[in-house]
Every structure is written in structure tokens, then in C-alpha cells.
């Protein structure tokens, strides 16, 4: 019985740790990310037609939620002709995440 309790505790502790996303203050983000946050607060309009599309969280770096919970928005990158690698991902619960390396890492935005 003790083994089973320890096993389940380790399993749940590991899954919770996987969702420990570092935080970043909104004021320390690049200017373009702060502009995207302002657009999100005002409801747009957004410059890219892909903005607002479902982010699938296939990388499983954010807390697991049902499909459609997360939406992604482009953060302009000066000097880049395409959308670049920077995004803000927004959860339906009001949480915001920033990635500057095309979903390899995330930081939760504190506003």
C-alpha cells in the first residue's frame, strides 16, 4: 500500500512540475510584445490573419486543457519578412504566455 501511495505521489508531482512555467513581467517584454498585449486588451484589430487561431499545445509545455482553450497571436519582429518566432498565447482563463523561440519555451506574463 505504501508503495502505491508513493508511486502516485511521484506521478502527480512530476506532471505538476512539467507545467511550472517561468514568469516574466509585462513591462520587461520587448516593445512589440507590449504592443500585442495592448491589442489583446482592446480586442484588436490584429495585423496577421493567423492571429486568434487555436494553439494546440502539442509541445505540452503549457497546462493541458481541451482543444480550443489556447489562442495564439503574433508578436512583430523587426527586420523579419514573415511572422517570425515570437508569439503570445492566451488561455481562455485569462492567462498570457510569451515565446520568443517559436514554442520551444514559454514564460507566463505577469501584468
Regions found by a protein language model. Name each.
Residues 18-63:
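N-terminal secretory signal peptides
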Residues 13-15:
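N-terminal signal peptide c-region/cleavage motif recognized by signal peptidases
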Residues 1-7:
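Bacterial N-terminal signal peptides that target proteins for export
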Residues 44-111:
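Functional cores of ribonucleases/endoribonucleases
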Amino acid at each position: 500500500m505504501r508503495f502505491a501511495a508513493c508511486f502516485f505521489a511521484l506521478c502527480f508531482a512530476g506532471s505538476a512540475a512539467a507545467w511550472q512555467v517561468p514568469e516574466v513581467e509585462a513591462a520587461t517584454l520587448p516593445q512589440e510584445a507590449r504592443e500585442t498585449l495592448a491589442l489583446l486588451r482592446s480586442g484588436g484589430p490584429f495585423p496577421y490573419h493567423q492571429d486568434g487561431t487555436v494553439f494546440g499545445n502539442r509541445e505540452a509545455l503549457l497546462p493541458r486543457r481541451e482543444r480550443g482553450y489556447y489562442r495564439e497571436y503574433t508578436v512583430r519582429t523587426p527586420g523579419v519578412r514573415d511572422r517570425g518566432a515570437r508569439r503570445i498565447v492566451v488561455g481562455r482563463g485569462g492567462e498570457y504566455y510569451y515565446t520568443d523561440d517559436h514554442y520551444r519555451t514559454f514564460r507566463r506574463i505577469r501584468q
